């Protein structure tokens, strides 16, 4: 099903993932052609899995990837970073908010993560596949991670706008879904940031460490604004980054930390303090999705639990 959503449900011109899909074809906000950068990074990886499993031929898969990369080469970018949304028919930025009409470094990281997976899949292939890998390599090298330090500060900022500059004013600290952004920024062969950006910005010189228990399960890190975040905080950064054996001076095992964060989510749903029908050991998972109140980052706490189990 994830493969079919991204394969059959793609916006026709760009080949990218739609921001939302309405089965009835009715779009009250007239946004049927709006595509998302980060979500497309996830979709690209799903398509790769589909190619590898024979859901489509290798030639069909390559053609889709070529369409996607051709769109990305021409679509609006801001110091190499992509916006959260575009109009899929034109490649022009669709503002995510009043002042959010420029680069979104977090969503860009999710997209680059997917593109790098494609790069590795094709780098030793035939001539057409190698050519596509080279084009992806250039997109990766074009992202100016250093620009998003807002004047060489030792932290990365989420947004920059050609109209409003840094007015969104959102420096990113951990832990949340953004770890992959800091990893890619440090790894960039052309615009790599110094290690101090990770240590001072992401880890806040050790303030990210905050051992505690939630639902009786041990967590080692501080989670921004909550004791334990939504499920996607344990997922997005590790689609392309293997947590097994991964550690640093702030976390002795990212695999065990993310496993425990996931188990907190399950334990909360089993306890089900708001008594939702259906919640239990085989029906759980609070993460970002639609709800009766629109989009919400559903989390394992009573304030952010709206009774939505996201498929």
List each language-model region with its residue ranges:
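Ser/Thr/Asn(+Pro)-rich, low-complexity disordered segments
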Residues: 1-311
């Amino acid at each position: 099903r994830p493969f079919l959503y991204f394969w059959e449900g793609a916006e026709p011109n760009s080949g990218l993932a739609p921001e939302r899909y309405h089965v009835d074809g009715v779009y009250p906000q007239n946004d049927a052609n709006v595509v998302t950068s980060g979500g497309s990074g996830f979709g690209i990886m799903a398509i790769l899995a589909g190619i590898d499993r024979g859901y489509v031929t290798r030639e069909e898969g390559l053609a889709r990837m070529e369409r996607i990369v051709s769109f990305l080469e021409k679509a609006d970018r801001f110091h190499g970073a992509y916006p959260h949304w575009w109009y899929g028919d034109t490649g022009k930025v669709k503002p995510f908010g009043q002042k959010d009409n420029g680069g979104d470094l977090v969503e860009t990281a999710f997209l680059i993560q997917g593109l790098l997976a494609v790069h590795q899949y094709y780098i030793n292939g035939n001539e057409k596949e190698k050519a596509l890998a080279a084009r992806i390599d250039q997109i990766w090298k074009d992202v100016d991670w250093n620009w998003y330090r807002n004047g060489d500060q030792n932290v990365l900022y989420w947004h920059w706008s050609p109209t409003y500059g840094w007015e969104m004013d959102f420096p990113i600290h951990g832990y949340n879904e953004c770890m992959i952004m800091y990893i890619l920024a440090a790894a960039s062969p052309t615009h790599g940031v110094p290690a101090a950006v990770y240590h001072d910005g992401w880890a806040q010189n050790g303030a990210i460490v905050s051992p505690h228990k939630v639902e009786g399960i041990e967590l080692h890190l501080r989670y921004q604004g909550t004791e334990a975040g939504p499920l996607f905080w344990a997922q997005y950064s590790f689609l392309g980054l293997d947590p097994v054996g991964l550690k640093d001076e702030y976390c002795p095992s990212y695999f065990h930390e993310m496993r425990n964060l996931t188990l907190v989510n399950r334990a909360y749903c089993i306890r089900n303090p708001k008594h939702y029908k259906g919640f239990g050991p085989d029906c759980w998972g609070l993460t970002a999705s639609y709800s009766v109140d629109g989009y919400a980052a559903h989390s394992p706490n009573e304030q952010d639990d709206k009774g939505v189990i996201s498929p």
